[in-house]
């Protein structure tokens, strides 16, 4: 039997097992954002990610290294753009993004408006985003696409889902019933900017996935 670790009401599997299953919600229990923050504070060295969606606690294991590479490259590109067009600030998780009372997420990469960054840069809880980016992992794909998406669509003007296996980005906006599928290039034109953020989607995946010489 696989070893299991209990944290309050949540059973955690070792990373090598958890990577093969979906994100695990706590059962028979509704959580609050305050309780989830306390759980994070009580486990500062834990590798799982804790998120709250519609009162359910989601626990995600540590991601693969290629996931981290995708996050790092996206952050670098967004920050480069925002240095030229200072209309926001880009960061990565772990960060507490509380968009609703029962929606506390840790998007892989996110952009907050400049006014929000000025408000929270010495605090902890982010409440407004311009863009949320999730990079799919085997353990989180279903929840990034289905469970968390409505919360992002209600509160964020752009939600990007990066699919490393398919080499595409799904772009969701608040009124969308289906995503825009982007495989070659994409643009994001935030309010107040003089020029859009332009992403060579194919080039991005080449940089993330293809080792030198391939």
Regions found by a protein language model. Give the residues of each.
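Gly/Pro/Ser/Thr-rich low-complexity, intrinsically disordered segments predominantly at protein N-termini
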Residues: 2-214
